[in-house]
């Protein structure tokens, strides 16, 4: 387990993380793909290089800059043509 990133808390509103010594709250409003994830998968988070974290089983990556300044990165979902099949 990489000690540079740890899950501190999981609740109904989101996830509290410690990344490189700083704490961040990830609201499910900003990361909805983590809301229905298994707790064991959410707990398995690791550094992905120096500038990002990842949840390998969930295929989710987040840049640390997004954690520091979430207001700069609005959540925009794009539909693919397969969504209509």
Q: Which residues fall in each region the model found?
A:
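Motif-centric detector for short Cys/His coordination patterns
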Residues: 1-85
């Amino acid at each position: 387990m990489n000690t540079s990133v740890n899950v501190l808390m999981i609740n109904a509103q989101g996830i509290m993380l410690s990344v490189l010594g700083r704490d961040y709250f990830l609201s499910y409003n900003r990361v909805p793909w983590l809301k229905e994830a298994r707790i064991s998968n959410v707990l398995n988070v690791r550094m992905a290089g120096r500038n990002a974290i990842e949840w390998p089983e969930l295929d989710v990556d987040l840049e640390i800059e997004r954690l520091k300044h979430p207001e700069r990165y609005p959540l925009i979902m794009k539909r693919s043509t397969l969504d209509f099949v």
